[in-house]
UniProtKB/Swiss-Prot annotation:
Chief localisation class: cytoplasm
Pathway: Cofactor biosynthesis; coenzyme A biosynthesis; CoA from (R)-pantothenate: step 4/5
Native species: Bacillus anthracis
Site (Transition state stabilizer): 18
Subcellular localization(s) per the UniProt record: Cytoplasm
Name under which the protein is recorded: Phosphopantetheine adenylyltransferase
Record's keyword annotation contains DNA-binding: no
Length: 163
């Protein structure tokens, strides 16, 4: 049986922290779908298509990663892909509390889906897409925070010179 996992998020934009979780998940599972979810509570900076393109470029060297988007429930997407696992990265205890609520709801919706938590690498424990955008907005260097394709996209969006 093929083991298929879903790594979902808004990825607005994808960071090196996200990429670390995806790479580590790809070592454990046969296939990993990186799925951009349309979060109605967030106003995206990059369009869904832009985010998909950025993720595709950032993950192009990971052969068992596929990139997609979805606007419904994650468990429905997982069923559609015959996935048996959801991957979630944890930066801190505060992440766990939120993720536990989501995991409980997903389990209520589909008891066959397991959630796997991966602790983020310490060097990314402070990192979030929001922080990256804030740093880039004011011309700060994000070179150690995001893949090169994302750095270029941020500079273009904010029209700031590369540092």
């Amino acid at each position: 049986m093929t083991s298929i996992a879903i790594s979902s998020g808004s990825f607005d934009p994808i960071t090196l922290g996200h990429l670390d979780i995806i790479k580590r998940g790809a070592k454990v599972f046969d296939e990993v779908y990186v799925v951009v979810l349309n979060n109605s509570s967030k106003k995206p900076f990059f369009s869904v298509e832009e985010r998909l393109d950025l993720i595709r470029e950032a993950t192009k060297d990971i052969p068992n990663v596929k990139v997609d988007s979805h606007s419904g429930l994650l468990v429905e997407y997982a069923k559609m892909r015959n996935a048996n696992a959801i991957l979630r990265g944890l930066r801190a205890v505060s992440d766990f509390e939120y993720e536990m609520q989501i995991t409980s709801m997903n389990r209520k919706l589909d008891e066959n889906i397991e959630t796997f938590f991966i602790m983020t690498n310490n060097q990314y424990s402070f990192l979030s897409s929001s922080i990256v955008k804030e740093v880039a907005r004011y011309g700060g260097s994000v070179v150690d925070l995001v893949p090169p394709v994302v750095e270029r996209a941020l500079k273009e969006k904010f029209q700031t010179p590369l540092k």
